[in-house]
Amino acid sequence: LRGVAEKLDYLKDLGVDYLWLTPFFVSPQRDNGYDVADYRNIDPMFGTMEDLDNLIAEGEKRNIGLMFDMVFNHTSTSHEWFRRALAGEKKYQDYYIFKGAPDQPPTNWQSKFGGSAWEYVSSLGKWYLHLFDVTQADLNWKNPEVREELKEVIRFWKAKGVKGFRFDVVNLISKPEIWEDDFEGDGRKFYTDGPYVHEYLKELVRDTGIEDYVTVGEMSSTTLEHCIRYSGAEEKELSMCFNFHHLKVDYKDGNKWEL
C-alpha cells in the first residue's frame, strides 16, 4: 500500500482518477487474495490500516478515488464465520450452503477449479458448496443475515473514504431453488444469473447508499443481454460490468486450453 501511495503523483500525471485495488484483506492466499478471511482487516503482507488511510487521503488530494474488490460470492474457509459453522453453530452453518448426506454429493456439479463443487465435512455429515477452490465456501445469499453482514462491509469501507467497489463473480450469488444434476455440463447453467441476483444487487446498492458510486460487476459465464440489464441505469444495480466474451474468439472448439 505504501508503494501505491508513492506512485500517486505519477498516476495523476497519467490522468488516472480511479484506482482498482485487488484484494488486500487478510487471506491464506490460496487464490491471490480472492479467498478472504477477514473483510475489514488488511493482510500484513500489504501493510497496515494506517497505510491504507494514508493512501486514501493522499489519493483524495489528487482527485484519485480508490475502488476496492469485494469478494462476496464466497469466503475463505479460514473466515471466522466458516470456522464457527464447522464448530457446530447453526447460525453460521446457515451462512453457507451445507447440504446432502454422506453417501454422495448433493449434485454432480464441477468446481471451476476442477473436481467436485462439493466438499464433505464428516463432523457435520454434510457437504458444502464451493464453486471455486475447496477453501472458498459459497455464501448463502438467501439468508438475510448474510446480506446484512456484507452490507456492513460496504458501509465500513465507505466510511473510510472508498469511492467505488468491484464485485467479484457477482452474478453467481443467487443459487437455484431446486438442486439437480447437470448431465450436459458442469452445473453453471443452474447457478449463473440466478433467480434473485437482480433483487440482491438492487438491495445491496440501495441499502448501502452507493447508487452514485462507481460499481463494477465481474460477470462469469453470462450473456451480453444480462450484462446490459446489470448495468442499465433504470435497474439501479451496477455502473458497469465486464465479461469474457472477447477472450473466446480464438478458442478451438470451445476449449480454452488448446492452441
Predicted regions, residues:
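Noncatalytic carbohydrate-binding groove/subsite architecture in carbohydrate-active enzymes
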Residues: 211, 219-259
